[in-house]
Design a protein with these regions (language model features):
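FIC/Doc superfamily catalytic core
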Residues: 1-294
């Protein structure tokens, strides 16, 4: 759980501090690593945010990373490559090549895999791709996690340094990221999001006793309107008085299923991402083929 929390914290850092067109620095990369391994023992690193000072090997790979003395120069070269002003049509290819090169350098003692996926997410933002729409339920870098065996196989192809191997790696990454970005775009369609994900998530939650009929009715109205206040719910809850509706809203707010649009507001929106409804959302996403069924 700590490891997952660290990744979430690092992604918040990326979203807050990196915008399209901005340079990615070595400090930024080292900061991602420091946040990723913070407070971890077995999955941590003795020197968070610092390049390794010893040799390393890579699990499931025959590639032997360069001696530690060369890491700073290789990382400087990589950062210059990522920030170089090339035609936009090459952006996704640069994402693919930067991901492989980082793995090839293996700049840190531990946590390289987690850090490079965060770096890849950062590059997509830097190059202007819309990857935040889905609230991070989907992450375009999932292409590297869905089939780990194929991921390492394609990395090995690129590790040869041959043009054919690098082409195969780029094709693998571009195809995967394209598929994931299409999923994100699909979730940007309000009708699809409501009918295929959010409403089914409510039914799933109601069927498992997470919410009752009244709570489901309130949440459905919020999904259709995006926000509601007490008067908006009188039509769908004709048997309840205003005070009773206010009480129901208060219970949902206490559970994190509703949240005011701003502090002190009496206008509310649904809270899916950090509540008991999240399991229903995951179930709906899995049913629609958005996430793998492990």
């Amino acid at each position: 759980l700590k490891e997952i929390g660290n990744i979430g914290h690092a992604m918040n850092f990326i979203d807050e501090h990196l915008h399209a067109g901005e340079d990615i620095t070595e400090y930024f990369v080292r900061e991602l690593h420091a946040m990723t391994v913070n407070g971890l023992e077995r999955e941590g690193d003795k020197t968070p945010g610092a390049y390794r000072s010893h040799g390393v090997s890579i699990a499931q790979s025959t590639h032997l990373p360069p001696e530690f003395i060369h890491v700073p120069a290789y990382m400087q070269e990589l950062v210059e490559f990522m920030n170089r002003a090339d035609a936009p049509k090459y952006d996704l290819m640069k994402v693919a090549l930067a991901h492989h090169r980082f793995g090839w350098i293996h700049p840190f003692g531990n946590g390289n895999g987690r850090t490079v996926r965060l770096l890849t997410y950062s590059l997509l933002i830097k190059y202007g791709f819309n990857v935040k729409t889905s609230g991070r339920v989907l992450n375009p870098t999932a292409v590297f996690c869905n089939d780990r065996e194929r991921y390492y196989s394609m990395l090995a192809e690129a590790d040869t340094g041959a043009v054919e191997g690098l082409e195969q790696w780029c094709l693998y990454v571009l195809t995967g990221i394209s598929a994931e970005l299409k999923k994100v775009d699909k979730l940007s369609n309000l009708h699809f999001l409501n009918s295929k994900i959010l409403y089914p998530a409510l039914e799933y939650s109601k069927g498992r006793g997470v919410i009752n009929e009244t709570e489901s009715t309130i949440l459905k109205r919020i999904i259709s309107q995006r926000t509601v206040k007490v008067n908006d719910l009188k039509e769908v809850l004709p048997g309840l008085k205003s005070a009773q509706i206010t009480y129901q809203i208060g219970k949902l707010v206490d559970r994190g299923l509703l949240q005011p649009v701003e502090m002190g507001s009496r206008i509310y929106t649904a809270g899916f991402s950090k509540s008991d409804l999240m399991r229903g959302v995951i179930h709906a996403l899995r049913k629609e083929g958005f996430i793998p069924n492990f």
